[in-house]
Each structure stands twice: as C-alpha cells, then as structure tokens.
Regions:
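Conserved GNAT acetyl-CoA-binding A-motif
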Residues: 109-119
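Conserved acetyl-CoA pyrophosphate-binding loop and the N-cap/start of the following alpha-helix
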Residues: 91, 95-103
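Short alpha-helical
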Residues: 9, 13, 125-126
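Extreme N-terminal starter segment of soluble prokaryotic enzymes
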Residues: 1-2
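Hydrophobic adenine-recognition pocket in adenosine-nucleotide-binding enzymes
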Residues: 6, 85-87, 120
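Acetyl-CoA-dependent GNAT
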Residues: 5-9, 16-77, 83, 101-103, ...
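A short, internal acetyl-CoA/4′-phosphopantetheine-binding micro-motif in the GNAT/acyltransferase core
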Residues: 82-92
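Conserved active-site alpha-helix within GNAT-family acetyltransferase domains
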Residues: 98, 122-140, 146
C-alpha cells in the first residue's frame, strides 16, 4: 500500500469515494456529475484542493483524502482542512487511514501549515472514533452556517 497524489485517471474512483462518503456520513445521495465537476476543477488547480489516493499493489485506488487551505490573518499562515476522506470497507481498521493522514501532514509541514483540522458529522460515531484514534481532538469552535 502506498499513498500518491491523485491524477486525472483517478477521477472515477474519487467520484465514487466521495459519493459513498456522503452516503455513509450524512445519508445523502450526491449527483455524480456534480461531484465529477467539483473534483475535476480541483485536480486541475491544486490551489483549490489537493487529493491523494491510497493504492494497492496494482496501483488501484482503495481510498482517498483531500485537503483545502484556509488563511489565518491572526496567525499569518494557513490552516489545513481535511475536506473528505474515504477508505473502502475492506481496508478499514488496518491502520491505513494513518497513511493518508501522514501524506497530508507531511505536505502541510513542508508548506509550514499551522495545523490540520477537520469537521465530522456529529452522528457519524465511527468516523469520530477513528479521528480520535488518530489523535484529533474536539475544538472549542462550532461550525455555523447561513443558508441562502
């Protein structure tokens, strides 16, 4: 197993992983064409988001992670956010999530990022436990939204 930066040929896998992540995390069904459009934009412009894939011995993606950056004027640097992360069920519970996180953390440190953050659906207990096992902790902040 190894982690590498995603390439355009990985797009079908990334679309599938993202759709499955949304279904598992929120019970929501996403439109594949919309996912493809959004992921493709980021694959072509890494300033929007960066994707990595975990591949098996045949170089077939079995999981992915994407990260975005948020500027902090208070700290004059970028916070890195896990935007999405997914592992195929057959690869869960084997320490493979840490391979994906290590790739993100490595690049974040190279670019002098401030810290790695993520948000997780409050009812997704499996993901919360996995992130806690990866040493993420709860923040003092809550996410709030203003809908159109």
């Amino acid at each position: 197993m190894k982690v590498r930066k995603a390439v355009l040929d990985d797009l079908p896998y990334l679309v599938n992983f993202t759709a499955e992540e949304a279904r598992e995390a929120e019970g929501s069904i996403k439109i594949p064409e919309t996912l493809e459009k959004g992921i493709l934009v980021a694959l072509r412009d890494p300033s929007i988001a960066t994707y990595w894939v975990l591949v098996d011995e045949n170089n077939t993606p079995v999981g992915s992670v994407s990260a975005v950056r948020e500027w902090s004027d208070w700290n004059a640097g970028y916070y890195w956010w896990i935007q999405s992360m997914f592992l195929s069920k057959s690869h869960r519970g084997k320490g493979r999530m840490s391979l994906l996180l290590d790739a993100v953390k490595h690049e974040m440190k190279e670019q002098r990022g401030l810290e790695l953050r993520l948000y997780v659906h409050k009812d997704n207990r499996t993901a919360v436990r996995a992130y806690q096992n990866a040493h993420f902790s709860k923040s003092d902040y809550e996410i709030m939204i203003l809908s159109n």
